[in-house]
A protein has these predicted regions:
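Generic hydrophobic segment detector
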Residues: 55-81, 86, 210-212, 234-242, ...
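Membrane-associated alpha-helical segments
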Residues: 225-227, 231-320
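Extended, charged amphipathic alpha-helical segments
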Residues: 182-234, 238-246
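Short Lys/Arg-enriched alpha/beta "domain-start" segment
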Residues: 1-197
Length: 320
């Protein structure tokens, strides 16, 4: 299948990304990352060291035959497979994502499974797909008996987190986030656009309009990167929320050092994003000020550590 909006390609791609701190006390090494993400025996874990350590599991397919989410209640039906994978960044942050793409129409009757398995990660409608209704419905969340891609991502996350190699001793109190996304081809003459929305319950939604020919897998990679950096912002902001101005909190320096040791070096926007989609990240960063906020928080952490080091040197010793 081709890219978004091409004659042989899909008219819609949707997915969900879950992000959390790997439940272990220290960042794991490359060999351990490979063990964690070895979800299939017939395909190797992909490892990268540049621009940072990055491990990607083999893809897993989940067969579905159900109604897609719909804001209009349209009783459409899709059949095929959702593709999912797990990603580990610098041995420290774990992500699981699941996504699919869909063409505008399919056969009027359901075909045998062999027809669908030849197009992994594609859900083919029975008849026509109400694209706008499904796009809006996916972002709003699934109803009863509707496709729930988030549950596929969550199941994969739980599978990795149950691995016996993890010690479940977290160095930081962190939040878990979910990012739900849709992508459709931009109409002729329309510029690329991204609409990013945050909710208080850890859910983020991203609605994308992208150039014709954009590969759904590239969109999924972009949204994993957006989810990672949103999680970093959220987690560090949560740790700094209500930070006392004084030096009476003896446990505070340890919290600050943990942020430096485990998270501050992970900020690397677009590090694993397809080059054709770099401008989407840049547009979001320009409007939302993600990098500016990150730099301010990082400087605040370093200033607090320096201030506490200076104060500790000037405190009188017990014998004075």
């Amino acid at each position: 299948m081709g890219g978004l909006g091409t004659p042989s390609g899909p008219v819609l791609a949707c997915g969900e990304v879950r992000t959390r701190l790997l439940p272990t006390s220290h960042a794991v090494d490359e060999r351990t990352a490979e063990r964690l993400l070895r979800l299939r025996t017939d395909e190797r874990v992909r490892l990268s060291r540049h621009p940072n350590r990055y491990a990607v599991s083999p893809g897993l397919l989940t067969g579905v035959d159900c109604r897609p989410p719909s804001v209009t209640g349209a009783r459409s039906r899709v059949v095929g497979t959702v593709t999912a994978r797990a990603v580990l960044v610098e041995g420290r942050v774990l992500q699981s994502s699941a996504h699919f793409s869909a063409p505008a129409s399919g056969p009027d009757r359901r075909r045998p499974w062999g027809h669908y398995l030849g197009r992994p990660g594609c859900l083919i409608p029975v008849g026509r797909l109400p694209v706008r209704s499904v796009t809006e419905g996916f972002l709003a969340g699934p109803g009863p008996h509707e496709l729930d891609v988030g549950s596929i991502a969550e199941s994969l996350m739980a599978r990795v987190c149950r691995h016996r190699i993890l010690d479940f001793d977290l160095p930081l109190t962190t939040v878990n986030t979910s990012l739900r996304w849709t992508a459709v081809p931009a109409v002729e003459g329309e510029v690329t656009s991204v609409l990013f929305t945050k909710a208080d319950d850890g859910l983020r939604t991203v609605a994308l309009r992208l150039p014709h020919g954009t590969a759904p897998a590239a969109v999924a990679g972009l949204c994993e990167d957006l989810a990672l950096h949103d999680w970093l912002l959220t987690t560090v902001a949560y740790a700094l929320d209500g930070l006392p101005a004084g030096h009476e909190d003896s446990g505070l320096p340890e919290v600050l050092r943990s942020l430096v040791d485990h998270l501050l070096h992970l900020w690397m926007p677009r590090g694993h994003v397809d080059r054709t989609l770099h401008t989407v990240w840049e547009e979001l960063d320009e409007h939302a000020g993600c990098s500016r906020q990150w730099n301010v928080m990082g400087q605040r952490i370093r200033d607090q550590l320096v201030l506490r080091a200076v104060r500790s040197r000037h405190q009188p010793s017990a014998g004075d």
